[in-house]
């Protein structure tokens, strides 16, 4: 009985450590946000872009285009366009985040002198003190 309880407690501790890792939590948040973002992009394409594009396409709504015996080429093309829009927006977001990180790192690097500069300043103060004596 004790060994079962010990294994159960060990399992629970391992599971808790796994869940509390930053990567797992971040991944869960990313999946949830990604699902919501998918709805936004689908609405953007379906409700804003396609009503502008459909009049230019002979036959109207291209998402319902079928080739041969049921090959839904329009639906596939729509999924590809949705993917490209999502990928492009994510690229822009990641690029903006990276630019912000670089600026932040530059500010931190400029604010903190490196070790050699600190040592040089300390040596100069020591030399000034010795000269003053």
Swiss-Prot record:
Membrane topology category: Multi-pass membrane protein
GO MF annotation list: mechanosensitive monoatomic ion channel activity
The keyword Transmembrane appears for this protein: yes
Cell compartments where the protein resides: Cell inner membrane
Keywords: Cell inner membrane, Cell membrane, Ion channel, Ion transport, Membrane, Transmembrane, Transmembrane helix, Transport
Cellular component per GO, a single term: plasma membrane
Residue intervals passing through the bilayer: 17-37, 73-93
Similarity comment: family membership: Belongs to the MscL family.
Self-association state and partner proteins as the record states: Homopentamer.
HAMAP family: MscL
Name of the molecule in the record: Large-conductance mechanosensitive channel
Organism: Synechococcus elongatus (strain ATCC 33912 / PCC 7942 / FACHB-805) (Anacystis nidulans R2)
């Amino acid at each position: 009985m004790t060994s079962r309880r010990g294994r159960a407690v060990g399992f629970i501790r391992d599971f808790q450590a796994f869940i509390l890792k930053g990567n797992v939590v971040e991944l869960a948040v990313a999946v949830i946000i990604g699902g919501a973002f998918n709805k936004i992009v689908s609405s953007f394409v379906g409700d804003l872009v396609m009503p502008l594009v459909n009049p230019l396409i002979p036959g109207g709504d291209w998402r319902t285009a079928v080739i041969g015996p049921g090959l839904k080429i329009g639906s596939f093309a729509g999924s590809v366009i949705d993917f490209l829009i999502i990928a492009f927006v994510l690229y822009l977001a990641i690029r903006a985040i990276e630019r912000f990180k670089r600026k932040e790192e530059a500010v931190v690097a400029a604010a903190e002198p490196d070790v050699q500069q600190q040592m040089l300043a300390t040596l100069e103060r020591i030399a000034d003190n010795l000269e003053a004596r």
